[in-house]
Curated annotation (Swiss-Prot):
CDD domains per the UniProt record, alphabetical: CYP27C1
GO biological process: C21-steroid hormone biosynthetic process; cellular response to peptide hormone stimulus; cholesterol metabolic process; cortisol metabolic process; glucocorticoid biosynthetic process
Tissues where this protein is expressed: Expressed in the dorsal third of retinal pigment epithelium, but not in the ventral counterpart (at protein level).
Cellular localisation: Membrane
Protein name, per record: Cytochrome P450 27C1
Enzyme Commission identifier(s): 1.14.19.53
PROSITE patterns hit by this protein: CYTOCHROME_P450
Function: Efficiently catalyzes the conversion of all-trans retinol (also called vitamin A1, the precursor of 11-cis retinal) to 3,4-didehydroretinol (also called vitamin A2, the precursor of 11-cis 3,4-didehydroretinal), also acts on all-trans retinal and all-trans retinoic acid. The replacement of 11-cis retinal chromophore in photopigments with 11-cis 3,4-didehydroretinal enhances sensitivity to long-wavelength light. This may improve vision in fresh water which is often turbid.
GO cellular component: mitochondrial inner membrane
Substrates-to-products reaction catalysed: all-trans-retinol + 2 reduced [adrenodoxin] + O2 + 2 H(+) = all-trans-3,4-didehydroretinol + 2 oxidized [adrenodoxin] + 2 H2O
Organism this protein belongs to: Aquarana catesbeiana (American bullfrog)
Main subcellular location of this protein, as a coarse class: membrane
A Pfam family assignment: p450
EC category name: oxidoreductase
Amino acid sequence: MLWQCWLQQAQRMRMMMKALLRFRATRLDSEMMGGWRRGAQRLAAGVVEGQRTLPQEGAAAGPRNLKEMPGPSTFRNLLEFFWRDGFSRIHEIQQNHIREYGRIFKSHFGPQFVVSIADRDMVAQILRAERDAPQRANMESWQEYRDLRGRSTGLISAEGKKWLAMRSVLRQKILRPRDVFIYAGGVNEVVSDLIKRIKTLRSREDDGETVTNVNDLYFKYSMEAVATILYECRLGCLQNEVPKQTLEYIEALELMFSMFKTTMYAGAIPKWLRPFIPKPWEEFCRSWDGLFRFSQIHVDGRLREIQACLDRGEEVKGGLLTSILISKELTLEELYANMTEMLLAGVDTTSFTLSWATYLLAKNPQAQQMVYDQIVQNLGKDTVPTAEDVPKLPLIRAVLKETLRLFPVLPGNGRVTQDDLVLGGYLIPKGTQLALCHYSTSYDQEYFTAAEDFQPGRWLRHGHLDRVENFGSIPFGYGIRSCIGKRVAELEIHLALIQLLQNFEIRTSPKTQTVLPKTHGLLCPAGAINVRFVNRE
């Protein structure tokens, strides 16, 4: 009887959602048409102040309106995402829509209207034309939580002048390559613990070589490594007995990612329906509470240590957190928010990328051998690498770039137009949400020959002036709103890959065949990646 009751409620919900979405879609079409007419009138009059017009080769003589733009219907999106588990196949749906509608198309998703772009040159034009503070796509639920709890926004959730002010503080400390070099020693200590952990885990297997589900291992490595930089402390993630406080944070982090799908459902449900469907929002808030609590404990702990040093008349030494606390360039609430959001952004993104890189190297032994040979030739088998050593190993950097091309952590990125925009022959009004389809451009044969293949060599420079730049694959974004943690992530992955290859030959395991990606907020492995770490002779 319970399942029958649930089914009846679900059917009623579906009917309500359909009616709601149909109403909202109609209203949005009307609003977008109104915006187009106003924009067209301003264009005709030649008085569009500050507009960035991006003509597309081969476009029609005059801009077309958004009603003429192709795209899936609201009902089709509803069916695809809510009935066919489309949230786990966003990357596939992206490609299907491009094949059907072309490289620019529109979509209605609940109350949101989105124009999707899957053209490398259009993406480049959009990003190069951005102002000083580009606006990302709607993150209303994040803002609502912060308003509810009296929390500040951080770099991921903030917009406008506040975002720009925080960005200017943090970019001076972690965005330039030379700024992150000082963290290499701490990261190498974590890599050493990672190697020890691999040896422990494989010793428990019958063959003495296999590590099952390497992403679980890399998750702990990533969390430990980024915490040494953000919090200036060790968390014990790679110990046999993980501390309780760290386990509680891991639980909150896993809850945040495990409920991605329900959060997406909640985003399409109006606030007035929350009393009837409270669980998604309650769990969303609970996970954020845990993440903020963890950051606050570590920030406050470091603040007490600094004060104790000052009370003793001692010189205060430290890294990123210490520098910000002493300079007071951010308020304490802003610091809590940024540490929380940067840790959230820096764990799964790094662990998934390391998992895919390990998988690709195991599946491509010839490419792996070339990388290893370059390491031995330029560094040796036993030398612990520094950040300064990485430029000597262009293949290591190319492996990371090629891994992120094949498996971009974010299959798409969002922007909101800050001016009326002519793109692909269409007039897109100010305030329109854009989805930049990075997964699809990464696999476009026009931009990458043999796009399905793992070919790190495509990223190598053939001369000192030959810069390999391709907007078909920009996993860290571009311009002022590019990933603030790019250099930190690269450092963690480069140093880990170098030392993994110095110690082990990475081979496929009979337990793992082909692993496909799925979308779970981020692009992640749909199944466990099991590999063999064989000792180097």
